[in-house]
Amino acid sequence: MMRTLITIHPLPLLLLLQQLLQPVQFQEVDTDFDFPEEDKKEEFEEYSEQFFSIGPTRPPTKEKVKRRVLIEPGMPLNHIEYCNHEIMGKNVYYKHRCVAEHYFLLMQYDELQKICYNRFVPCKNGIRKCNRSKGLVEGVYCNLTEAFEIPACKYESLYRKGYVLITCSWQNEMQKLIPHTINDLVEPPEHRSFLSEDGVFVIPP
């Protein structure tokens, strides 16, 4: 019977045999995997890097700062659950651990970037030089209160309206200074008298 089929229909059988023996990588495979859209590519790469990288993290980019730090009007900034909601929604963490503190700022990126060209002032946590905003900015300070690993992180949310202190770094691709970290959001009533003789804003240790 098999000999008869081979004799009568040699070509179709050869094609079928070739298909069966063809390496898997050359066959068409239908999958349900969804690859990241173009506007999600950086976020996907950042997620992979945080969990699988063993080297130093990449410096922050414009899109990362916009996504993780800058906020739009919506939930009231004085809401008790603001930080818990936003930190989880914006995936603010380092590898699989909670961040000890974080700031959300109600401002545009261009306004934040301009601060990089303001005068230097002292800042907290042993950092010698920060750039300070000229005007007051609304934001939320998030302070870790419970747990150390995601997703159990719990934060205290503190509304602030004050001067933003940031550090900046030079980005070769853009040939510009860009915001690197938010060091503090200093409310003026508490530090109103801390001005040096030349008008430089000074924060006590």
Curated annotation (Swiss-Prot):
Record keywords: Disulfide bond, Glycoprotein, Secreted, Signal
InterPro entries reported for this sequence: RNaseA (IPR001427), RNaseA-like_dom_sf (IPR036816), RNaseA_domain (IPR023412)
Keyword Zinc-finger: no
SMART domains, sorted: RNAse_Pc
One Pfam family from the record: RnaseA
Gene Ontology cellular component list: extracellular region
GO biological process: one example: defense response to Gram-positive bacterium
Cysteine disulfide partners in this protein: C98-C153, C116-C168, C123-C130
SUPFAM superfamilies per record: RNase A-like
Subcellular location field: Secreted
Primary subcellular site in the record, as a coarse category: secreted
Gene Ontology MF term list: nucleic acid binding
Gene3D superfamilies: Ribonuclease A-like domain
UniProt family annotation: Belongs to the pancreatic ribonuclease family.
Name the record gives this protein: Inactive ribonuclease-like protein 9
